[in-house]
Amino acid sequence: MVKPIIAPSILASDFANLECGCHRVINAGAEWLHIDVMDGHFVPNITLGPPIVKSLRKAVPRVGDKESDKPKAFFDCHMMVAEPEKWVDVFVENGADQFTFHYEATKNPLELVKLIKSRGIRAACAIKPDTPVDVLFELAPYLDMALVMTVEPGFGGQKFMPDMMPKVAALREKFPQLDIQVDGGLGKETIPHAAKAGANVIVAGTSVFAAADQKDVISYMKDNVRDELRSRGLLDIDM
């Protein structure tokens, strides 16, 4: 069984007020924070690195941390980097809860999955729009999550690509218990497409951080996903 998860992308936040912005979206109903790490090599943009994650972890403790009364969240680190193997340990040390690497960035994805899991966090694999979904079929049984990009990775604020939804549908059909994430252009207008295809983890940047009513946007997207999962008999009974 899977559950609906909304993961606001901090790439769309006001970095001058990152702690406050993250607390706001968590208080509005977000369980995860999606942290886009770009190195200027695998993708043309450069965003943030381990020091930011380390500092943000102090501001946003892990779920289950009973020593802090601050809003808590799961850190979903989307690693748009060359040679992702080199970055596993440092991101684990600095607070990552999940390490999502790109299939296109590694020569041995299964060994990388094993490395990530050996460090005690979740392993996920992402594919670019031009990458066929079937490359994930052999790897998926070892993954905690698969990510189907619905924009070209590298920059926020791009237009949603609905033609990526057959990839999501194919993954959901073959792996009904797998967390399946979509990333790029998600908001109120596009969430029905993602939910219907079978995605349960929704990355949303501008549509959440720039919303006048963040709780309304998050609830709307979560409800769409929840209704579809329930209709398929896949909804986590705890929801």
From Swiss-Prot:
Pathway: Carbohydrate degradation; pentose phosphate pathway; D-xylulose 5-phosphate from D-ribulose 5-phosphate (non-oxidative stage): step 1/1. The active site is at D36 (proton acceptor), D183 (proton donor). InterPro entries: Aldolase_TIM, Ribul_P_3_epim, Ribul_P_3_epim-like, RibuloseP-bd_barrel. Its cofactor is Co(2+); Fe(2+); Mn(2+); Zn(2+). Substrate binds at S9, H78, G154, F155, G156, G157, D183, G184, G185, G205, T206, S207. Its EC number is 5.1.3.1. GO terms for cellular component: cytosol. One of its GO terms (biological process) is pentose-phosphate shunt, non-oxidative branch. It is an enzyme of class 5 (isomerase). Keywords: Carbohydrate metabolism, Cobalt, Iron, Isomerase, Manganese, Metal-binding, Zinc. A divalent metal cation binds at H34, D36, H78, D183. Binds 1 divalent metal cation per subunit. Active with Co(2+), Fe(2+), Mn(2+) and Zn(2+). It holds the Pfam family Ribul_P_3_epim. It catalyses: D-ribulose 5-phosphate = D-xylulose 5-phosphate. GO terms for molecular function: D-ribulose-phosphate 3-epimerase activity; metal ion binding. PANTHER family: RIBULOSE-5-PHOSPHATE-3-EPIMERASE. Belongs to the ribulose-phosphate 3-epimerase family. Catalyzes the reversible epimerization of D-ribulose 5-phosphate to D-xylulose 5-phosphate. This is Ribulose-phosphate 3-epimerase. The gene is RPE1.
